[in-house]
Design a protein with these regions (language model features):
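Short active-site segment of divalent metal-dependent hydrolases/proteases
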Residues: 148, 178, 233, 307, ...
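A short C-terminal boundary segment appended to hydrolase-like catalytic domains
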Residues: 103-136, 371-386
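Conserved beta-sheet core of the metallophosphoesterase superfamily
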Residues: 12-14, 19-106, 299-382
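Active-site-proximal loop/helix segment associated with metal-binding centers of metalloenzymes
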Residues: 90, 243-298
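A structural signal for short, well-ordered beta-strand segments and their strand-loop junctions
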Residues: 42-43, 64-66, 109-112, 171-174, ...
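A short, well-structured beta->alpha microelement
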Residues: 1-33, 125-130, 283-294
Length: 386
């Protein structure tokens, strides 16, 4: 079907016929207000771009997304002033498409595919070629920021279902530890801490047990679990460095033990969790340090996204500038900007610290052989149409 006019797929997503220059550096420029008013829209561009548009304090965000191309790149120009943009467009050209599944008049699911020069592509652990299809295990499944103890059970089940279907070789975790029990952002909020105490959420030992149990469950789904050093993981190191445990009698003994680990040059979170894990789970887990590179199919997967170059604040732009092809986390908002991709979150979509309109979404990323990627989104626990 050739789309000649804007076409609604349901009440929340439509195909847009807006026409862009193929050399447009960022195909979302100036279009946010269209997504804000009219809903998620898919439109043509030889680049694959995804950007969220917050619309409400309580509703899910809308998205602007471009398709990629089904034609080979050809941006040749004899005009001197066009050669720069032609060169950039050649670099950013993607053979690909967006798959949109419609459940009903409100719910839809989308994910990206990229094709190689022979027309082969991967979707949900299956390789499709011009002559047939076959199972193909993803190289990695990067989960939306995990936040043990604040993980939404519906998102958790969705990712477990995806992992059981596709059997990824490795699962990569961002913000595996939440740090609610020792959160420095809340140390002066006495009434909030009183509420946490009533709910049993100020015990560091219990929070570590929750993470250990989660890691044992996740490790059963894959060959290797990779834990990316993230800002919430570092909450524990900060808690120990500032000796705030002196004011927390319920955490004091455990914190003293972990403080010695820091003095000995060890990662306190790794030490605490390793002691709690069953041996068969522990041997599958790889802990990255803050400066470790970790590449899957030449895609940087070892940076959480909270740090930019030279210790500056991180962003997807800084991930692209530093690493080129990457999959990061931190923002809780799925996004694609050329080779830099960002997953969403696995936590509840409303926490104590994200007030107002939100672009958060349950979203994770599959990395396939050759480096093709697709974001998988879960809406109320559902991630595709049965």
């Amino acid at each position: 079907t050739i789309v000649l006019e804007d076409t609604k797929l349901n009440s929340n997503v439509f195909l847009s016929t807006i026409k862009l220059s193929a050399k447009h550096i960022d195909p979302t420029t100036g279009l946010g207000r269209i997504g804000q008013r009219n809903g998620t829209f898919v439109y043509a561009s030889p680049k694959q771009r995804l950007k969220a548009v917050p619309t409400s304090n309580s509703e899910l965000p809308h998205f602007m997304m471009t398709t990629g191309a089904i034609t080979a790149s050809n941006y040749n120009s004899e005009m001197y002033m066009s050669q720069r943009t032609a060169y950039i467009a050649e670099h950013d050209h993607v053979l690909g498409a967006v798959i949109v599944e419609i459940k009903d008049d409100k719910i839809y699911h989308f994910r990206q595919i990229q094709a190689d020069a022979k027309g082969s592509f991967f979707d949900l652990g299956v390789k499709y070629t011009p002559t047939g299809f076959s199972d193909s295990r993803p190289e990695a499944f990067v989960l939306g920021d995990w936040h043990a103890g604040s993980t939404d059970p519906k998102a958790r089940q969705a990712w477990f279902d995806v992992a059981e279907l596709t059997s990824p070789k490795r699962i990569i975790l961002h913000d595996a530890f939440d740090g609610m029990s020792i959160n420095h952002h809340e140390q002066h909020y006495k009434l909030l801490k009183a509420k946490r105490a009533e709910n049993g959420q100020l015990s560091l030992a219990e929070e570590l047990k929750i993470l250990a149990k989660d890691l044992e469950s996740i490790s059963a789904l894959t060959d290797e679990v990779v834990i990316v050093k993230s800002n919430h993981d570092q909450f524990l190191e900060r808690y120990l460095q500032e000796a705030r445990y002196v004011q927390d009698p319920h955490n004091h003994r455990l914190a003293l033990k972990l403080a010695i680990e820091v003095l000995d040059g060890k990662d306190p979170l790794k030490s605490a969790i390793t002691e709690l894990l069953k041996p068969e789970a522990s041997k599958k887990i790889r802990w990255l340090s803050i400066d470790d590179d970790y590449a899957v199919e030449e895609i940087q997967c070892g940076a959480h996204g909270h740090l930019g170059a030279n210790g500056a604040r991180g962003s997807l732009q800084s991930m692209e500038a530093s690493y080129g092809n990457s999959v990061s986390g931190h923002s809780h908002t799925p996004e694609i900007m050329r080779g830099a991709w960002c997953v969403g979150t696995s936590s509840y979509l409303k926490l104590d610290y994200n007030k107002g309109s939100s672009s958060w979404l349950h979203s994770s990323c599959l990395i396939h052989q050759g480096g093709s990627r697709q974001l998988v989104n879960a809406i109320d626990g559902e991630w595709h149409v049965e």
